[in-house]
Amino acid sequence: DGGPCDVGVESTIVDCSEEGAPPVILRPGGVTAEQIEAVLGHPVRRTPDGPSRAPGMLPAHYAPHAQVLVVEDIDAALASAAARARAGERTGLLTPRAVTVPEGVTALVAGDTPEAYAAALYDRLREADRLGLDLLVVVPPPAEGVGVAVRDRLARAAAGSAR
């Protein structure tokens, strides 16, 4: 653990090796597709074809020990967390901003902007491990800017933690 950092998610990996073809984002990261396009002056492909060619793309790469359940709607996330806590599971709820959580649910806050969420993401996943949670219900940030990279990491954490 290198401690707190400003960006949080790892670097963006871009493949520029195919002459005449647009660059391809192999792994979204702290530098967004929009930022790359602004520098290059033309679009980049956001989805690579074929098998993964970048590190950090395996589903389990980001998975904490707790099962991760990504839920888009805060009310649905609260209901899911409450039900699982009532069933006896040690449950956490990771949200962009502070919310009042049901009894038996541990609140974890990532940050109310995609950038703040990205900077806090890995610390919150490790905190879920330190707390010994069985389940971490996650409300992701919007799918814009670095939020795309955060959602990618959350999807991988959820896939890698599926029980």
Label every PLM stretch briefly.
Residues 2-163:
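Active-site-adjacent structural elements in enzyme catalytic cores
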